[in-house]
């Protein structure tokens, strides 16, 4: 039978798992933002080839609403700016979380080697 881990190691492992879950959620949100940014860039590229007086329709809920090119471009550029800001924020948070996970992983491995010095192979990997 496997030995039960000391409470302080269990607490650190729980913290490690929480940080890992937090990183996973952050990466999912970041991916969603990056996908939306790519879509906005494609739409802006398509709009750039249209005449200024071109008729444009945008989806609002379940409706197609007539709009002008300038206002649609402004809305898209505003949204793009907001998403880019969020993306930069998420990149910083990701970096911080990865560093915390790395530090915690080293701490847990150190604790495990203290409790199980003969094991040699005991440790966790991110």
UniProtKB/Swiss-Prot annotation:
This is Prefoldin subunit beta. It comes from the Archaea. It is found in: Cytoplasm. GO terms for biological process: chaperone-mediated protein complex assembly; protein folding. The keyword Cytoplasm applies. One of its GO terms (cellular component) is prefoldin complex. One of its GO terms (molecular function) is protein-folding chaperone binding. Keywords: Chaperone, Cytoplasm. Belongs to the prefoldin subunit beta family. The keyword S-adenosyl-L-methionine does not apply. InterPro entries: PFD_beta-like, PfdB, Prefoldin. Heterohexamer of two alpha and four beta subunits. Molecular chaperone capable of stabilizing a range of proteins. Seems to fulfill an ATP-independent, HSP70-like function in archaeal de novo protein folding.
